């Protein structure tokens, strides 16, 4: 049960909210990009702390705040994570070379031999969100990951959802052990983090009209 109050924390009743103009908010949200090329400079602990100081404000069911984060603070640790993902992929190839993880793994292993990181895209930092398996709403972790991506964007830090990392940490005991994720914890997802190597364009990407069923 959350310690901050389930209905209306006293501090919230006294808070002063600054107005955020609609145009500024829309511009911020629409200019978010998935970053897949990073500078090698890792994010400082100060920058990471500032990002997660915003992330902690993500809403959770009953204000339980169940999300725990595992964050690699330097490129060396992140490279160890990449190597462990490759180990998992080799295991998948050995077990069933026709499975989807094996087919994807063969391609990523070949890229790694060429010196290309196709798994975490050379990002110097990574973050994994976990919640207790006993928590009824693992979606809280996904919401927190979305806050992470947006908080990073607000500070000029690039982020991208780490699908390969998420798959590996959910299925490979060796990686879970390295990340100190317990058996009673559910992995909600992961993201790569770092300063963009190329400044993203400020133009809005094309999107299809939103699919809405009006009742």
What feature does the model see in each segment?
Residues 89-102, 177-203:
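A glycine-rich helix N-cap at a beta->alpha junction
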